[in-house]
Amino acid sequence: MRRLSKRQILLLHDQLLSQSGGSPGLRDDGLLESALNAPFQSFGDTDAYPSLPQKAARLCYGLVKNHPFVDGNKRIGAHAMLVFLTINGTELVYT
């Protein structure tokens, strides 16, 4: 399973802000790291979020809830979730 790196998230965030406006800046690096790692938590041999959709949802939730950026946290959460699903082979159909 492919993960989004911190660098990729920062680039996606910059792209979103350039397209939709907002204040740039990372508010808390630790909260960003936490949001990126949370979907891949495990306890013993058991994944906390075993399926791709669960991991994607947890990534979105972490970025929104942790609020690591100055602005655009909900936007990056939703966008990162969709990019994560796409790079892991999920075909997204918008109707």
Language model: regions and residue ranges:
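FIC/Doc superfamily catalytic core
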Residues: 1-95
